[in-house]
């Protein structure tokens, strides 16, 4: 499949001043502290995610950093109930049972969850977590984690064939297709929009319970893809809790895409409150135009020429 030509719109910081904080802000925790490897620079991406939420003027954001795997979790007991949603910029192999139980109870009681990119690599053996996020990849996941999920002929389907979970090609721009235009997160978005260069996750596996796919992207075999329309944005329910799962956002240039920023801000608001009041910015990407914030991309010290 030939790659589509596209344009890039570079947006300067002008006009993106942070608005005054709402009188009753939405309380958000960003949880970080570990990644499966150095390729996910969580210390850097957490600062970008925090900036993007604070720019919306709706959120009061606190970063909570967990001990690294194998560290001392005895004193790590976050008060999840203080927050309306927890943003996971975090990929760890396991948690102590009491911490798992605390988080499960938080979500069952109505706490929101936002899973960003490699957060869906975490906790392969924690059944409740995998039910919360719907699908995940890597860290030894196989068919035991659940089927592959993807779109075919306009419908969500599953494939129980054996095999590993999780793959991606090179970080290239790709089109995102909205599959549910009536959900509060995606309502008003273009049917198709171009995302900046990013890892396009494919072949994820999981239980897929109570999962609605909001948007997909075609995983092109010419870039080591699956040849399927893979889930990019999903929403789920777990008890009374709402979960927004985005597979986008590998690095700072990908996070600087206005498409990522907008869906992340709106998805976090929905996970926390069940509604979305934020407008779609005029700078949102089109079907053939990548739109990104140069000031955000420049938060990466390696940034030189912008997103791919």
Stretches found by the model and what they are:
Residues 93-184:
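A glycine-rich, often tryptophan-bearing local segment used as a flexible ligand/cofactor-contacting loop or short
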């Amino acid at each position: 499949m030939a790659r589509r030509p596209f344009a890039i719109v570079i947006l300067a910081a002008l006009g993106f001043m942070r608005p005054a904080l709402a009188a009753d802000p939405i309380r958000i925790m960003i949880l970080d502290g570990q990644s499966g490897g150095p390729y996910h620079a969580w210390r850097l991406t957490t600062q970008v995610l925090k900036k993007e939420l604070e720019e919306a003027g709706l959120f009061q954001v606190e970063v909570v950093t967990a001990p690294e795997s194998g560290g001392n979790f005895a004193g790590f007991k976050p008060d999840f109930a203080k927050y309306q949603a927890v943003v996971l910029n975090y990929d760890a192999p396991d948690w102590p049972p009491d911490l798992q139980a605390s988080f499960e109870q938080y979500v069952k009681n109505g706490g929101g969850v936002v899973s960003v990119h490699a957060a869906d690599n975490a906790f392969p053996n924690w059944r409740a977590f995998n039910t919360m996020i719907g699908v995940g990849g890597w860290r030894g996941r196989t068919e035991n984690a659940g089927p592959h999920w993807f779109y075919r002929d306009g419908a969500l389907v599953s494939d129980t064939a054996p095999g590993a979970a999780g793959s991606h090609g090179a970080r290239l721009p790709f089109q995102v297709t909205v599959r549910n235009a009536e959900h509060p997160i995606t309502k008003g978005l273009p049917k198709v929009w171009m995302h900046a260069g990013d890892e396009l996750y494919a072949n994820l596996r999981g239980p897929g319970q109570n999962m609605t796919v909001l948007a997909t992207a075609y995983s092109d075999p010419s870039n080591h893809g699956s040849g399927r329309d893979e889930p990019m944005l999903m929403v789920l329910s777990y008890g009374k809790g709402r979960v927004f799962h985005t597979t986008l956002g590998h690095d700072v240039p990908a996070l600087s895409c206005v498409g990522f920023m907008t869906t992340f801000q709106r998805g976090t608001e929905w996970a926390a409150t069940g509604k979305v009041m934020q407008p779609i910015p005029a700078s949102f990407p089109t079907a053939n135009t990548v739109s990104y914030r140069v000031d955000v991309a420049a938060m990466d010290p390696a940034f030189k020429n912008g997103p791919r």
